[in-house]
Amino acid sequence: MRPAILGVTTQSVPATYCMSRGNAASVARFSSGPMPNPIVWNVDPVLVRLGPLTVRYYGICFGLALATGFAVWFTRVRRFGESAAFAEQFLYFGVPAVIIGGRLGYCFFYAPQIYLANPLRVFALWQGGIASHGVAAGLAITLWAFSRRHHITWTRLSDYFAPAVALSVGWIRVGNFFNSEVIGRPASVPWAVVFARHDLVPRHPAQLYDLLIGPFTYLVLLAVERRNIRPIGSGLIAGTFLTVYFGLRIFVEQYKDFYVEQLREMPPFRSIEQWLGFPIHTGQWLSVLPVLAGMFLIGRAMRSGVRLSEIARTNH
């Protein structure tokens, strides 16, 4: 065994350890001998303890996500002629949208029966639980409200904002990794990770797969924008973001472990799963609508027939 550094080691994990955790079906395909040096992740999610107060890696990552998103948003709106005051005002709308939308999304997308039976538990933020699809819904509503307030189209604001989301969302997945949550399914790949605070099963580092989606989507958006296909405000950038990001989310979700997800137990979702013959994550179900919305926005933008070179005439 190599010495641990910040709780990270690489060591052989006997398959019998995995079997003892009740994952026999998941690890049956592994050999009965030792696993080939998986990474063992055993980092304390708390960075600093100050009496009853704690500073967690997730909280730091959440702050970095907000800072990154605002920096990209501010740079873009200034580049396209909006004022600094305009950019800063959105901060007062966007931050509550992220927190409220993310929390409500987690409560009612993943455990609706629990929170409908006891609605006050929604406010128990210290118990954790923020859903990215809820964040997306909250931001979409906020962009609409902000566009009405400032007499600017929703598609223009969304084209400003989409790259900011793409580049900042990865920080949340880093926080998930430090928390040893949103873990992957059992795996025998060379980069498998044992999340020792969860169990001793080598798994896909699904958080890191999700992490890669954001920068990749950001690069796609830059490429689309630089090709001068349609002007900012056509909705092409926002549509491309929704289609690429959530399309990749549907793909990556298959590597995540399954949990008790009440939405999947409700009709018609359970009936569709039974008809298809394979399980579908709640995250996959929730990603379908954004992908369809993105495809609609792309089609609408492409039918507009206006090129980016005409932006000067359509910007305001």
Model-flagged regions — what are they?
Residues P3-A4, G22, P38, A301:
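Absolute N-terminal positional cue centered near the fourth residue
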Residues R29-H316:
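Hydrophobic, membrane-interfacing alpha helices
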